[in-house]
Amino acid sequence: MSTGKIIQVIGAVIDVEFARDNTPKVYDALNVVEAGLVLEVQQQIGDGVVRTIAMGSSDGLRRGMEVKNTNAPISVPVGHGTLGRIMNVLGEPIDEAGPIEYTEKRSIHQAPPAYDELALSTEILETGIKVVDLICPFAKGGKVGLFGGAGVGKTVTMMELINNIAKEHSGYSVFAGVGERTREGNDFYYEMKDSNVLDKVSLVYGQMNEPPGNRLRVALSGLTIAEGFRDEKRDVLMFIDNIYRYTLAGTEVSALLGRMPSAVGYQPTLAAEMGALQERITSTKTGSITSVQAVYVPADDLTDPSPATTFSHLDATIVLSRQIAELGIYPAVDPLDSTSRQLDPLVVGQDHYEIARAVQKVLQRYKELKDIIAILGMDELSDEDKKIVDRARKIQRFLSQPFHVAEVFTGNPGKFVSLKDTVASFKAIVNGEYDHLPEQAFYMVGSIQEAIEKAKTL
């Protein structure tokens, strides 16, 4: 084990000098013995000097401190010992429940599976959320992105997906908290505990208060644990909240490493970093990883380089819209912006496909008519258009749904709606079978039966 010494500290970036013939490799983990800090090598500068990122606070470091090379990348424990535990980026327990028992540790830097090992699946995962199941269904082993600006409900929608899928799902789940609020991580832990599914979940946190090195690598640590379960022939659910903070941590580190920024100040290696993470989140012939990723959209601009780079890696995109949230419709999913590769007659069936498209057609026509209504009022519309507006407003309200995870705030019990009920209900609304009901009856209900019951009380 070769030793070197710190020669420069700039925030989270630390330069370490080793003997020239013992220079550490890129991605090797180094230990600052006195401070108990782990560094990860990012660049070899020359003459035995390496530039590293600190996986923790660099407070108290000084020049001349001794650094040991572990001759291996950062490794985290994988397997059953991680279930029910909260770990940090290094795979160390942070839940004060004793050491983690493990038989294997894996490097957080792995090559993605080879092309001939990949497996495709068209089996649809039922989420119980009407708008998701109808407009952007997702497959087992697929990748789903939840896009939205600040405060439109990404985390709540993700928690509901976890609630509906992970609790019904017999396999294991991995949750990676990347640069999000510690409070949310805490709430999530206790929620899993209360619903008795904690023994099926591994939690890896690198939250907002952590240095950029932790936030940059914590997604990889979580993914390594998920890959471990996948290689045991299991179906794994992988939740990442939030992928944007992974990009942001890369941006913070990139400037300190001396790279020239590219568009909007992002790191020039944005696409490569995103690809390195996303290409590993995939299903093989041994097992599947189904991932749900929250993606923060800066200033509600979907063309920002970070969300735009993420788009290309996903099978389904659920776009949350501020305009819909302002109408009080939650989940605030935009049915015209959200897409899924699974919305194909060969996958979901002709009936489902046609109804989803009919719903989008009605909503699109309503969107076009809004300008006319704003200028001339409803009276100037033809009878046919009036009918479309009426149905569109009912559809819009019926796409809202009370969530189980929001029950404590709203007082409305959460609803799980089966895919069969969802498709049948929207078919009836589009065909005009419920034209006689007031639109308010469709707001915040589960099935169409509840809307009929609600109409009686209005």
UniProtKB/Swiss-Prot annotation:
GO terms for molecular function: ATP binding; ATP hydrolysis activity; proton-transporting ATP synthase activity, rotational mechanism. Its EC number is 7.1.2.2. It is found in: Cell inner membrane. It is a peripheral membrane protein. It comes from the Bacteria. ATP binds at G148, G149, A150, G151, V152, G153, K154, T155. GO terms for cellular component: plasma membrane; proton-transporting ATP synthase complex. Belongs to the ATPase alpha/beta chains family. F-type ATPases have 2 components, CF(1) - the catalytic core - and CF(0) - the membrane proton channel. CF(1) has five subunits: alpha(3), beta(3), gamma(1), delta(1), epsilon(1). CF(0) has three main subunits: a(1), b(2) and c(9-12). The alpha and beta chains form an alternating ring which encloses part of the gamma chain. CF(1) is attached to CF(0) by a central stalk formed by the gamma and epsilon chains, while a peripheral stalk is formed by the delta and b chains. This is ATP synthase subunit beta. It comes from Francisella tularensis subsp. mediasiatica (strain FSC147). The lineage of its organism: Bacteria, Pseudomonadati, Pseudomonadota, Gammaproteobacteria, Thiotrichales.
